[in-house]
Amino acid sequence: LVSNKIKLPKLEGKDAMVLINHSCLSIALTGKALSDTLNVFMMMQFSALFSFEAFIGNKQIFSPEVNELRVSPGQNECARWYYNIFKNILKKPRRLQDPLSFRTISVCHGLGMTNITRLIEYWENELNGISDSPVVLNNKDLVSTPNFHNPALAQIMESVALSNAMIANGSFQRIQ
């Protein structure tokens, strides 16, 4: 800091605790990962869309009637996105049963979007929460808290990574 002529700030109260608290780093890294994931996810959506169209896949797999038979997380919303794009395309499909990598697009991508949505919720909760411990309550009591620990954020990040890996594997299978 000195070599760059940056004046050191005066620290007060719990400033040092804030600087060494892992929550700030977790929030920042999660925000970056979330931004990258949203970009990559949309690319994976379009990649599947173009692959499906080039393959002349059976578009019935995206119909509302089919996707309401068994509701997986995000499946209906994802299928509806593809259905709305394909509904006016009248090409006859190559076959009744396409390879699994095509038939499972709405299930896998739907779960991916569900996990991303949940990640956003957990990240916003952490961003807007107080992770201090101890804290001073309104009645001026000093109490210990568990708020510094957020395993939900770590677990949903892991779920997003697993969903992305599953979607990437499907994409890989479609190009073989």
Predicted segment positions?
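Active-site rim segments in enzyme catalytic domains, especially the processed small/beta chain
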Residues: 173-176
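Accessory "access/gating" subregions that flank catalytic or transport cores
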Residues: 52-169
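Mobile "lid/hinge" segments at catalytic clefts and subdomain interfaces of large enzymes
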Residues: 1-81
